Amino acid sequence: MKGMIIVNVDKCNACKSCEIACAVEHSVSKDLYQAIHEDPTPRARVSVQQGVSFSVPLQCRQCANAPCIALCPTDALYRADPDSPVLLDEEKCIGCNWCVLACPFGVIYLDEERKVVFKCDQCFQRVQRGELPACVSACPTGALMFKMLEEIPKERRNAYLVEIAECLTGGGV
């Protein structure tokens, strides 16, 4: 059951609803009004990056041979099974930053306050319950979609990754 969060940069208006939904989903209370008072404050695992003519929500791309997993000295980053997203065991994380440096997309972050990293887990528990990731559910324009890999032709997957890479390096869109 390998899924992927797909971004249509033409539909993203940088409203950041995905960021808010993500932070709330990863809060203790799961409620916006309570989450803003939690300590530590919940953090979004998706970040909307704005270019000159486009915006793109960025989150973990769930690399097949994830360098973050390979470099983690404590095995805090792992896959529950071969088809699961890259997950984080915060109890094992020592905040060494190796995964942050290794991530080719720059989407693993260090929580300075707690001295542990945080990253997108594709709302693994929500997806297991048959729900969409919080960012996808919250997107008012449909710029974010969650698709199973078998639903996406290989050519489209490759074209999508090239498109995102071009956006990140200043080319394209």
Predicted regions and their residues:
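Aromatic-flanked redox-active Cys/Sec active sites in thiol-based oxidoreductases
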Residues: 9, 74, 90
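N-terminal beta-strand motif that seeds the catalytic metal site of vicinal oxygen chelate
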Residues: 1-10
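Flanking helices and flexible, charged tails adjoining ferredoxin-like Fe-S electron-transfer domains
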Residues: 2, 28-62, 69-70, 90-92, ...
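Residues that cap or initiate secondary-structure elements
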Residues: 11-13, 126
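Ordered, amphipathic secondary-structure segments that act as subunit-interaction surfaces
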Residues: 62-80, 84-85
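N-terminal signal-anchor transmembrane alpha helix
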Residues: 13, 17-23
